[in-house]
Amino acid sequence: MPRLFGTDGVRGLANGETITADLALRLAQAAAHVLGQDARDPRVSGEFIAAAVAAGLASSGVDVFDAGVIPTPATAYLIADFDADFGVMISASHNPAPDNGIKFFAAGGRKLADELEDRIEAQLSRPVLLPTGADVGRIRRFADAEDRYVLHLLGTLQHRLDGIHVVLDCAHGAAAGISPEVFTDAGARVTVIGNDPDGMNINDRVGSTHLDLLAEAVLAHGADVGIAHDGDADRCLAVDHTGAIIDGDQIMAVLALSMARRGLLAERTLVATVMSNLGLRIAMAENDITVMQTRVGDRYVLEAMNEGGYSLGGEQSGHLVIAEHATTGDGILTGIQLLGEMAATGKSLHELASVMTVYPQVMINVRGVDRDRVGDDAELNAAVARAEAELGDTGRILMRASGTEPMIRVMVEAADQATAERHAEELAALVTERLAI
């Protein structure tokens, strides 16, 4: 039977096979047993799932403080600030509105270790002894949750954002009520799009996975910069004043150099995943900064940061963790820190991001193959070695097995698009030929 927990909690189609009211209630009861706050994004299904989670927790003797619609990183922050035992976020992040998910945070606002998730999952199949009468938990509204989080974010800024015109794309998500307030209070001139959540339009052609609208708005309004969040606001991607997309790797490069300059980049090390662009490693090496690479997934970035005591890490997708101020990826925090660097240096985002050259990257998903044999086929390994020799220091190849389906991802970076495409297509064809099921 496949593991219930994925890389970011339990996720699936709301009221489908996985994310049901019954599962939410039982999962909450199991979590109460193992771990012993409740928040969500604006998806319409979040209402019944949050109610079921709250009921499951309270019926297990846990006092629940319902923070309502807030970003995932706000939940993590409030767990620590409120000294809660644990917390729950109802969200499917950047997924479309029909999906939803349940993710748990431990005390201090940190993501659960695999071992704790496994214990919760195992508890689902065991009988649960529930309290009765006066021993059940209470469900209360966390009235000042949003205000606490806003004050925390504003307190992280070293420079006000006066004079910077920013377009915010809130993805019709959890950032809608908070991000514009934070940027405005910090002094920026704010234009907002994707800020009318109705429960069904979250991430719908807006947000960090659909940047065309943001780029158009930045150009139309003559803004200095655009910032895009995803549905639960744990991501941040940007657009410069020319309409060019600035991805998570480029944002990490800007913030790493800023933190290194101020003596805040622990061990002069940045934590990134194997999917981060070769240009990031080259730019950091030129500035005497080490890039530590992890598996894909912000949880693995967090684990490496916690183990090594590092202060900055993230993913190309826009999950960035700034350890001084957050225990998880925080899109609003990342955005204001990025604009803070613009304010501190007087440089445009275009200038700041130019520290890194983005190498063309081509990804091909090869389906219907034996993912367990990646790396074991001699002919395929020889082809990869030949391609790597041709690319030299100006490219790289990564083959990655999917964790959920019979698929292998072939990724090639090169100095030019045509070379990257040629090698990716040749290797993908060979993967199909050699590893077909």
Swiss-Prot record:
Coiled-coil residue spans: none
EC number: 5.4.2.10
Cofactor stoichiometry and binding remark: Binds 1 Mg(2+) ion per subunit.
Phosphoserine sites (modified residues): 93
Example GO BP: UDP-N-acetylglucosamine biosynthetic process
Keyword set includes Amino-acid biosynthesis: no
Entry-linked Pfam families: PGM_PMM_I, PGM_PMM_II, PGM_PMM_III, PGM_PMM_IV
Enzyme class: isomerase
Record-listed Mg(2+) binding positions: 93, 230, 232, 234
Top-rank taxon: Bacteria
Entry keyword set: Isomerase, Magnesium, Metal-binding, Phosphoprotein
Protein family: Belongs to the phosphohexose mutase family.
Free-text function comment from the UniProt entry: Catalyzes the conversion of glucosamine-6-phosphate to glucosamine-1-phosphate.
Name recorded for this polypeptide: Phosphoglucosamine mutase
Organism name: Clavibacter michiganensis subsp. michiganensis (strain NCPPB 382)
